[in-house]
Amino acid sequence: MNRIFNILLLTLLLLVAGTFSVSAQIINEQGQYVDTVFNDHVDRTADDFVIASLLVADPGTVMYSVLGHACLRLQCPVFGMDYCFSYESEGVQNRVLDFLAGKLMMGLFAIPVEEYCATYRKEGRGVYEYTLNLPIEVKRELWRVLDEHVAEGVRLPYDYFHRGCAITIVDFVKEALGEMMIAYDDSLYEHTPTGRDLVKTNTTHALWVRFVACFLAGNEVDEPLIGDKQLLIPIDLVRAWQQAKVNGKPLLASEPNILVDGEPKVNDGWFTPMVLSILLLVLAVANLFWGKPYFDWLMLAAQTLVGCGMTYLICFSDLCCTEWNWLIFPFNPLPLIFWHWRKHWALPYAGVLAIWCFAMAAMTIWGHVLVDWSHILMVLAWLLVVFKQTKIFLK
């Protein structure tokens, strides 16, 4: 409560431009009393009265941190205030089922900078600061805008696609700018990537996370993103803002100030989703000749488990971007339900899977990625298991 009170008090101080003298005391984030005087000795129009910057944290190793994180840092040296305004969800570590159900909420938090950096230092993730070159009136308005969102609390459903950390920063700054515009470089409009393209490009260090993310993300993330709508990834936001201008001046500093040194990234190693998919495909081909039922049952169990999860996401979950997913064709619980009568439907279903694999591969080669290659190979392995159940193989 003290933190929120301090921030709201500072907002009031920023908005009041008095010519009278009033003695006051406020408390900074270190808990120290700071004597202030409302008089002409405090120049609220000075450019350094409020210092605004963009903070970007290195990617983590789990689903919710694999793309990194971005937040805004606002400082008022005169009054000893220094906060990170970070748009975050409720803790997901022990609430995975709530996450899959779409029950987690999001909100804007005001966190003292030292506390914010300590979290990333503990995780071995670097934090980099880029100064925002904004007019003082915009920086004061930005602080007011952020305070309002902090006061709203954690009230919005978790939505990584429409309310991710990077894209909300864009919205906050645009709101503070008012009629002023961010002039982006023409290169931002030369390409229209999809959300899936952006995730694939920025998760080469975490292939298993990308593999799982493709199961969670439906067709909504496959729509082309135009202009600043594609600034979903923190590092992409940095690159775009380093080339952008406001009032003819560069928006972002070109070189960062390192607040936390990051540790070297560790890749997934040799056992990747692609290796697993190739292994399953080889075993499926070999089992056409071996005729062992154990592999078929193992594949059916895995397909059913994934299929139940996929069906839940599409039909029952409120998680964003799960309304439809092309992976529902190969992954659903229907094969298990009708397994006893498989010789009657196995051949046409194998044909459906073959068409699906061909279509997904063609789309990927064409450049419109809907699934990963590892998913396609895995479905091919499942196709061979289904084909083995046809009258051609069943005696």
How does the language model describe each region?
Residues F20-A24:
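Sec/Tat signal peptide C-region and signal peptidase I cleavage site
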Residues Q25-T36:
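Cleaved targeting-peptide boundary
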Residues G60-T61, R125-N133, A151-Y160:
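Second-shell loop/turn segments in exported
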Residues L8-G18:
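Bacterial N-terminal signal peptides
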Residues I26, E148-I337, H344-K395:
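Activation targets extended, charge/polar-rich intrinsically disordered C-terminal tails
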Residues E137-E148:
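Short, charged, amphipathic alpha-helices and their helix-cap/turn boundaries
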